């Protein structure tokens, strides 16, 4: 398991201040505002590195699901002046959540229809893990309004991207059917830009590393926070391709949701569906904060402006939430994107009980496909307690709807 420890410098313990749910420390003379109770040692190292950046703006924010990442913790929110950091966005650019409420009462859906027609139908129509469609999907599903011919990575990946759109991916990506606290069926899914986002992220991070070395940058290469300045043409190139990946990730989720709705409507012809809620959690955007126009990097964090509707999923077999943002300026109008890992995937496989995980899900009558130890990578025990995460961000979001899983498909 990842070690949960105090901040690297003991003197920081004396600098800790609490403001409702938020805690504040100073690191390298930079305020770090935290909504997280425990942070692993790797994440603390990344926080220390981030606070050395000369272009960091105002403060660094860490959401309650924060844990170690690559360059920047997952659950981190970083504002910068005049630079973008590809690794502070991550490689699953535009990854996010979407959810749809139906008019169907869960108790009125026959179990055999749920298992044999709906869940089986989803598995047949939506490729999972590293799988993709054998044939390119219709171009109408792809993002529009972009000059892809000027995009180095996207342009050469368009053919394969048309086979990836409408696919779930692996890791912590999922499709869930859920029961709302009023008894109605919801559909929720978590997915991103597939291999396209990874190709774009890796390409521009490597480009930034090369340029930073050429410029004798003061940002050390070993902290994995290479940057592209606004004045450089590479900034505009990355920004255009990042925005395309965000749009592609949304198009990917929309296509999957449309096909899930079709499957449900085929099985239950009286089904109707409300408009889709969508929110991304890996991206950078120009925003105004504390009187200045800055670039906000959200890596495993979502925008939570006043009245903004969002989605915060729990871990496998636990509650998920539809929320309303409270627009807290101290978090750069952000909140968590989920529960957040408490242990690595390898530690979860090594230490958690397969029998206990299956028994826990089946005791709740949740339809699942857990078969082997590798499936423990995404077990609930590998994640933080979602109820504690939500309590820690009571000043960031307000819970509107509580959702409980009835069936889950993992990538």
Predicted regions and their residues:
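BZIP DNA-binding basic region
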Residues: 1-17
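Generic recognition of cysteine residues
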Residues: 5, 9, 95-98, 180, ...
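Iron-sulfur (Fe-S) cluster-binding segments and ferredoxin-like electron-carrier domains
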Residues: 13-14, 98-100, 345-346
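Low-complexity, highly charged intrinsically disordered N-terminal segments
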Residues: 19-24
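Domain-length cofactor-binding catalytic modules of enzymes
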Residues: 25-46, 55-62, 68-74, 78, ...
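Beta-strand elements of modular eukaryotic interaction domains
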Residues: 51
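Acidic, glycine-rich active-site loops and adjacent beta-strand->loop/helix elements
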Residues: 66-67, 95
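A generic, well-ordered mixed alpha/beta core segment in the N-terminal half of proteins
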Residues: 88-148
């Amino acid at each position: 398991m990842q070690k949960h420890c105090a901040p690297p410098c003991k003197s920081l313990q004396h600098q800790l201040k609490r403001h409702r749910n938020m805690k504040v420390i100073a690191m390298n003379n930079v305020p770090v505002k935290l909504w997280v109770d425990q942070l692993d040692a790797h994440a603390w190292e990344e926080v220390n590195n981030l606070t050395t950046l000369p272009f960091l703006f105002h403060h660094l924010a860490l959401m309650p699901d924060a844990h170690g990442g690559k360059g920047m913790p997952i659950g981190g929110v970083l504002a910068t002046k005049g630079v973008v950091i590809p690794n502070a966005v991550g490689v699953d650019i535009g990854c996010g959540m979407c959810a749809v409420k139906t008019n169907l009462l869960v108790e009125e859906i026959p179990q055999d229809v749920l298992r044999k027609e709906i869940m089986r139908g989803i598995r047949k129509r939506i490729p999972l893990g590293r799988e993709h469609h054998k044939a390119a999907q219709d171009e109408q599903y792809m993002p529009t309004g972009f000059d892809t011919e000027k995009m180095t990575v996207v342009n050469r990946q368009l053919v394969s991207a048309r086979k990836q759109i409408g696919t779930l991916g692996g890791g912590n990506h999922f499709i869930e059917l859920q029961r709302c606290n009023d008894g109605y069926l919801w559909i929720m899914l978590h997915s991103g830009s597939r291999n396209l986002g990874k190709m774009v992220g890796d390409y521009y991070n490597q480009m930034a590393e090369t340029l930073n070395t050429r410029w004798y940058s003061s940002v050390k290469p070993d902290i994995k926070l290479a940057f592209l300045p606004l004045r450089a043409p590479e900034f505009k190139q990355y920004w255009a391709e990042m925005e395309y990946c965000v749009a592609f990730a949304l198009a990917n989720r929309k296509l999957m949701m449309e096909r899930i709705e079709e499957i449900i409507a085929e099985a239950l012809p009286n089904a109707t569906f409300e408009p889709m809620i969508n929110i991304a959690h890996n991206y950078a955007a120009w925003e105004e904060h504390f009187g200045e126009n800055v670039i906000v990097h959200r890596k495993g964090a979502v925008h939570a402006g006043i009245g903004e509707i969002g989605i915060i999923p729990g871990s496998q077999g636990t509650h998920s939430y539809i929320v309303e943002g409270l627009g807290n300026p101290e978090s750069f109008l952000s909140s968590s994107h989920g529960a957040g890992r408490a242990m690595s995937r390898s530690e979860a496989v090594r230490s958690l009980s397969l029998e206990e995980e299956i028994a826990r899900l089946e005791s709740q009558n949740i339809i699942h496909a857990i078969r082997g130890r590798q499936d423990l990578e995404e077990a609930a025990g590998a994640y933080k307690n979602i109820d504690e995460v939500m309590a820690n961000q009571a000043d960031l979001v307000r819970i509107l709807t509580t959702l409980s899983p009835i069936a889950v498909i993992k990538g």
